[in-house]
């Protein structure tokens, strides 16, 4: 078993104590601390393919993949070679390079909704910049976001729903003044009625609606086609922009990202601004936002909307991202990934049913989610009904058997091209044992 070390021999424990003395909570991103599930985080020493090894040299099958970027698995030889070659040429220049132009051209070839793209270093930075651009382009201040959707930790987006439309949102973090979020309206995801009410009340004041097509911080909730269509209709009618946050879904759920899937159901569908991250960096700090030319030309140095970054378009990150996008563009890549992820989820569902455990699953491409609920939820309110204590037992049961899932109830999971049938079979077998204990 992967968690067989005793309290005196588990090397993760003293390392976590050292970390807590010098890093707030012992981690550099809160979910890594295991606060939601209890226990000690696994400190990773190395990773290869679909696996990583912790400080005890214990192997785990990895179903978070650095929270999404590692679509090819860890240490893909062609990606490693590209990164090593780029590193030999220099780490960072603070000047443009041909490679960032090639990466931009590659992204635009896969995303027809975008004429131009700007590189940044994180999804938070991309989302924050997209909002500034939307406000600068429209000359308006109000934005609409949805409860349960995460768009990074920019102040204006750290918002939870208030008691009604008239109250707007309420800050969800200390250090974020109410004045900063006073123009953020928070609505229920997939609620067309609330959406229409908001536009009826504030339509000529709304700069943009920002949304995730699949809300991965609600585990896995799809935006319904009618909901997505209505957002597109209302934004066009009122001169607002539709900002599509594909940081998690971009190039992972399909080669054309989630917007290509919705375009199959909504004639002429395209968002105004798209936010990208994770996969486009292949594991390096890289994100981007893009839109049609008239919007992007509002950005400095062409226009009045300021945005800059010391490490934007970093040469090593662009090499990693470019090689990743080249490899996932191979014919059949996403079909195979979707089938592999579906096999994992079907196996989980069958074993949960056999054990009499309420369970629902969904997946798209290499992204998946599951709930200890009899039916898939469609809103944050429904997601909140899932059994947290039972999930924690499931998480630790799988961890003990060497399978690493998100250490939080509401986080999506990720399958990579490196996961083999044998990996998935072993994971399903472990789930069979764990479901029997729930």
UniProtKB/Swiss-Prot annotation:
Pathway: Porphyrin-containing compound metabolism; protoporphyrin-IX biosynthesis; 5-aminolevulinate from L-glutamyl-tRNA(Glu): step 2/2
GO CC terms of this entry: cytoplasm
Family, similarity comment: Belongs to the class-III pyridoxal-phosphate-dependent aminotransferase family. HemL subfamily.
Alphabetical keyword list: Cytoplasm, Isomerase, Porphyrin biosynthesis, Pyridoxal phosphate
Positions carrying N6-(pyridoxal phosphate)lysine: 278
GO biological process, one term: protoporphyrinogen IX biosynthetic process
Domain of life: Bacteria
HAMAP family found in the cross-reference section: HemL_aminotrans_3 (MF_00375)
This enzyme's EC code(s): 5.4.3.8
InterPro entries reported for this sequence: 4pyrrol_synth_GluAld_NH2Trfase, Aminotrans_3, PyrdxlP-dep_Trfase, PyrdxlP-dep_Trfase_major, PyrdxlP-dep_Trfase_small
Subunit relationships: Homodimer.
GO molecular function ontology, one term from the record: transaminase activity
Catalytically driven reaction(s): (S)-4-amino-5-oxopentanoate = 5-aminolevulinate
CC cofactor: pyridoxal 5'-phosphate
Localisation per UniProt entry: Cytoplasm
One Pfam family linked to the record: Aminotran_3
Organism field: Delftia acidovorans (strain DSM 14801 / SPH-1)
Name used for this protein in its record: Glutamate-1-semialdehyde 2,1-aminomutase
